[in-house]
């Protein structure tokens, strides 16, 4: 049974922007949303890190940064595994929709991350973005969610497409 929506696409195509737009519109309708999304941080036009943001209240932690001195490396970034743990604890809250942005190489540095994502996918209504490098994982879970492949061509229309899927899943009129 389909319980949610997976969104994938190349870096920079607008997966997080879609998450922010969709969750904003659902919150206006009284849907309780829990989880997190990831935003990049730039200084002087250069990406220096990523923040993990609580979708409920905007509170955030550093997911990864070029100037951190500890943590496993993904590219030029040191990943803060404690921040990933913080993000995972957000999924323990009660909600109507569980948001995870994203399932990707940085998040996979946490030893329990993928297991926790699978718990959500198997038992909750969800909206999850998937890094293109994780396509094998999402393909094995397509029986539980609809898949939107985001591109520069469809990214604006995809907001309404995702909302339509979620309205059905959430039993909204």
Curated annotation (Swiss-Prot):
Residues involved in ATP binding: 9-16, 97-104
Organism whose genome encodes this protein: Caldivirga maquilingensis (strain ATCC 700844 / DSM 13496 / JCM 10307 / IC-167)
Keyword Isomerase: no
Catalytic activity: a ribonucleoside 5'-triphosphate + H2O = a ribonucleoside 5'-diphosphate + phosphate + H(+)
Positions of transmembrane segments: none
The UniProt record lists the keyword ATP-binding: yes
PANTHER family linked: CANCER-RELATED NUCLEOSIDE-TRIPHOSPHATASE
Task of the protein: Has nucleotide phosphatase activity towards ATP, GTP, CTP, TTP and UTP. May hydrolyze nucleoside diphosphates with lower efficiency.
E.C. code: 3.6.1.15
Family that this chain belongs to: Belongs to the THEP1 NTPase family.
Keywords: ATP-binding, Hydrolase, Nucleotide-binding
Annotated InterPro entries: Nuc-triphosphatase_THEP1, P-loop_NTPase
Protein name stated in the entry: Nucleoside-triphosphatase THEP1
């Amino acid at each position: 049974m389909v319980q949610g929506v997976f969104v994938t696409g190349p870096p920079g195509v607008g997966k997080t922007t879609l998450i922010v737009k969709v969750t904003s519109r659902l919150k206006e309708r009284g849907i309780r949303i829990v989880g997190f999304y990831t935003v990049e941080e730039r200084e002087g036009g250069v990406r220096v890190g990523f923040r993990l943001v609580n979708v409920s209240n905007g509170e955030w932690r550093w997911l990864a940064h070029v100037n951190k001195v500890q943590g496993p490396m993904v590219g030029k970034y040191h990943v803060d595994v404690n921040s990933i743990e913080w993000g995972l604890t957000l999924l323990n809250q009660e909600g109507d929709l569980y948001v995870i942005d994203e399932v990707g190489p940085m998040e996979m540095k946490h030893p329990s991350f993928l297991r926790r994502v699978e718990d959500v996918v198997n038992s909750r209504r969800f909206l999850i973005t998937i890094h293109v490098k994780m396509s094998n994982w999402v393909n094995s879970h397509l029986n539980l969610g609809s898949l939107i492949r985001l591109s520069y061509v469809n990214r604006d229309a995809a907001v309404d497409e995702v909302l339509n899927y979620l309205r059905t899943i959430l039993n909204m009129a």
